[in-house]
């Protein structure tokens, strides 16, 4: 039987509970999942890559079929081919996400027609949540409870101690 391997990518700057919900749900659908931290060339990162990887790895520690990977200046579809991924996993919060993902899927399919894209719709609880909003809350030192995993809260507290 074919092993189903998924790749869920994002900048995870920082990882949110919405991201974790997608991973949790996908982990039951796939034999193995790679969670890939990619830099978005159109955005300046708030957290350094190694910090994002540490927060994400800690947040996903209980998942036995999930591996965190990073990539610099490469297309996710190229990394997917290298990892022998069978499916790309994408989370959709709203129509704007869908339009973006629809365009991305078109090009991914051109580059790797054998890799399918699977979309998981965000639960209502997480549809308004984004890393951008979390960064805004961090800037104003607002509570992050119920929005991000403890690894992110601990990192933010550590950063606040230094200032």
Curated annotation (Swiss-Prot):
Entry keyword Transferase: yes
Keywords: ATP-binding, Coenzyme A biosynthesis, Cytoplasm, Magnesium, Nucleotide-binding, Nucleotidyltransferase, Transferase
Reaction catalysis annotation: (R)-4'-phosphopantetheine + ATP + H(+) = 3'-dephospho-CoA + diphosphate
EC assignment: 2.7.7.3
Any Gene Ontology CC annotation: cytoplasm
Quaternary context: Homohexamer.
Protein name according to UniProt: Phosphopantetheine adenylyltransferase
Native species: Streptococcus pyogenes serotype M2 (strain MGAS10270)
Protein's gene: coaD
